[in-house]
């Protein structure tokens, strides 16, 4: 397959070549990671007849690509299409335009006997039968994507380096267009992002595109996308600053949580002269705006138990002192949790009250951006007021942050307001919530991410979205080293017998390393350093079946079907003889679970 058109296109997508049978899951993970960092991937996700796939690939190269990723998965040697068609195309494109077209090899083959190195000879060895020139791939830079194994192999991901190099190359190629120091970044949170323009309102020639996949059930971004955003965002921000970007324009549509994360990542204190958010109506909400007149004011309200709203008694637009906020929200009680909703007149009271109840009946503060209307009809907030409103709302949140250790925040206002407000809140610890579907037509606020200062990423935590299986479990299997006895408040105890042998115990694997001995109090004490790994063995999920495992195994795995003994019962001698209940941890989604060891840990409350 040849093309008369040059393969390189500075803002074109990045082609992902992979073996469908053995590499589809890793390819989706790579795609998700790159999308979260501003790069648009191109991969054919359908298992079609060869002719159709070949036409799709040909079209992709003819339209122009900015780079390619060759994924080496265990099983790629069985592929015919990758070594015969895609690999030669990628190598040819790189040779034709080495500066404009980057080729990255992501290697999942571990070097024999090494805990963290990849087998650099794998490209040639795996593809040489059907691609005689495959050995030249060994000379290309290879990045690691290694899962842990039962032989001491550690999990290693260098996708951050792949993203860094792709961003750096793209910004270098587009430097003539970025000469004024301004960059355009398209945004999209939709069910199935692809390599095509988001829609007619997202300009296809934007320099970068951040796209998060939307969960079909909850209608909010998927947990895996948030976790990839957590790692990708600091890489993106570092490259923007390295390219001396001074003005950022975001455009398109997205959920408030993405807008909040971007605002925290580019706070007013950083070297950004102008931060602009172009909404889906083409209005620019700029950090430098000064409105000709003000029609939107800030009203501080709370919710009564029946869901009705009640003003806190402060004059509109007044920013109360910390002492005034304390009295209004907590009275004489100590300031703990607080639920905050940034709204633009519209809100759903019941999900807010349900969230407050979960947080030990925390007070609810509604920061309502009310736009006056002479005739009583709905009037939209003027975009030129956004910067000033964001600054004042940020001041209110900072005063709340001085009182409560943690703010629980949701936004029911334009996404631009979430971003402009967040730029003044990068020093606060905030748990952000999205209003999502939970089934049976019920809407509730779902905690999705945490932002706080002083860390490598503005997103310091992503919360699990796995569906609990408590209602589905009909049988429990004990996989701990000992019998587990349940002591109910009334009735006879019940015991789950221990497995027959230790090969069935679900335990966290570990590697040991002898260190120099401690010399204390005239004694020499040996010291062993323990490196924790994944759990093994891993029982297969089965409908209606739950597993009782050690607590540390449940915390490591984050599976919805893992339970552990909780609420200890002690015998007369003081030893533990059973439990009062079973415990479980928040479960990560099915897409996250295989990659949790390569991502940041679940935050602790």
Regions found by a protein language model. Give the residues of each.
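Switch/connector loops and helix/strand junctions flanking conserved nucleotide-binding motifs
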Residues: 77-81, 111-125, 351
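Conserved N-terminal substructure of TIR/SEFIR domains
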Residues: 1-67, 90, 98-99
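Conserved beta-strand/loop subsegment of P-loop NTPase cores
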Residues: 68-70, 100-107
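Surface-exposed interaction/ligand-binding surfaces
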Residues: 559-569, 573-574, 581
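Structured domain cores in non-transmembrane regions
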Residues: 484-554
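Conserved TIR/SEFIR loop-to-helix hotspot centered on a Trp-containing motif
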Residues: 74-96
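Acidic, metal-coordinating catalytic cores used for nucleic-acid/nucleotide bond scission
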Residues: 19-22, 47-52, 74-82, 256-257, ...
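Long, low-complexity, Lys/Arg-enriched
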Residues: 116, 143-150, 154-472, 477-483, ...
């Amino acid at each position: 397959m040849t093309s008369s058109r040059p393969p390189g296109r500075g803002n074109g997508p990045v082609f992902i070549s992979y073996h469908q049978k053995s590499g589809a899951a890793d390819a989706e993970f790579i795609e998700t990671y790159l999308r979260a960092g501003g790069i648009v991937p191109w991969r054919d996700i359908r298992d079609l007849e060869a002719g159709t796939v070949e036409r799709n690939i040909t079209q992709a190269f003819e339209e122009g690509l900015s780079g390619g990723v060759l994924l080496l998965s265990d099983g790629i040697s069985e592929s015919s299409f990758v070594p015969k068609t895609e690999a030669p195309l990628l190598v040819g494109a790189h040779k034709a335009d080495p500066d404009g077209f980057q080729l990255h090899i992501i290697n999942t083959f571990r070097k024999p006997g090494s805990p963290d190195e990849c087998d650099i000879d794998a490209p040639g060895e795996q593809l040489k039968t059907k691609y005689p020139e495959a050995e030249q791939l060994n000379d290309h830079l290879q990045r690691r994507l290694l899962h842990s194994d039962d032989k001491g192999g550690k999990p290693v991901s260098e996708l951050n380096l792949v993203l860094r190099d792709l961003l750096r190359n793209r910004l270098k190629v587009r430097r003539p267009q970025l000469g004024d120091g301004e960059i355009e970044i398209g945004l999209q949170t939709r069910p199935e992002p692809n390599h095509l323009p988001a829609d007619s309102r997202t300009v296809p020639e934007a320099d970068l595109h951040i796209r998060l996949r939307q969960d079909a059930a909850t209608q909010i971004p998927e947990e895996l996308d948030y976790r990839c955003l957590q790692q990708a965002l600091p890489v993106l921000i570092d490259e923007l600053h390295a390219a001396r970007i001074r003005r950022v324009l975001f455009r398109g549509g997205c959920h408030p949580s993405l807008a909040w994360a971007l605002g925290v990542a580019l706070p007013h204190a950083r070297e950004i002269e102008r931060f602009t958010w172009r909404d889906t109506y083409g209005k620019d909400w700029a950090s430098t705006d000064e409105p000709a007149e003000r029609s939107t004011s800030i009203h501080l309200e709370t919710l009564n138990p029946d869901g009705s709203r009640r003003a806190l008694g402060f004059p509109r637009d007044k920013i109360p002192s910390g002492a005034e906020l304390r009295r209004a929200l907590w009275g004489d009680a100590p300031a703990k949790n607080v639920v905050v909703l940034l709204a633009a007149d519209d809100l759903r009271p019941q999900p807010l009250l349900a969230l407050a109840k979960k947080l030990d009946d925390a007070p609810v503060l509604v920061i309502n951006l009310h736009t006056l209307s002479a005739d009583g009809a709905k009037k939209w907030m003027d975009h030129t007021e956004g910067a000033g409103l964001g600054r004042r709302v940020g001041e209110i949140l900072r005063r709340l942050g001085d009182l409560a250790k943690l703010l629980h925040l949701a936004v029911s206002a334009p996404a631009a307001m979430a971003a402009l407000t967040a730029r003044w809140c990068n020093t606060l610890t905030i748990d952000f919530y999205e209003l999502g579907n939970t089934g049976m037509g019920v809407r509730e606020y779902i905690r999705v991410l945490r932002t706080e200062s002083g860390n490598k990423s503005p997103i310091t935590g992503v919360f699990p979205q796995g569906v609990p299986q408590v209602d589905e479990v009909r049988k429990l299997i004990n996989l701990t080293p000992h019998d587990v006895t349940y002591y109910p408040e009334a009735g006879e105890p019940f015991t789950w017998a221990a497995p027959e042998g230790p090969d069935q115990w679900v335990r966290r694997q570990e590697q040991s390393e002898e260190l120099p001995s401690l010399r204390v109090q005239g004694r020499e004490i040996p010291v062993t350093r323990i490196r924790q790994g994944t759990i093994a063995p891993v029982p297969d999920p089965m409908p209606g079946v739950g597993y009782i495992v050690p607590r540390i195994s449940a915390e490591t795995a984050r599976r919805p079907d893992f339970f552990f003994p909780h609420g200890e019962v002690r015998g007369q001698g003081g030893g533990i003889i059973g439990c009062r209940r079973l415990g479980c941890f928040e479960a990560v989604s099915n897409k996250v679970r295989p990659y949790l060891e390569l991502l940041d840990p679940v935050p602790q409350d």
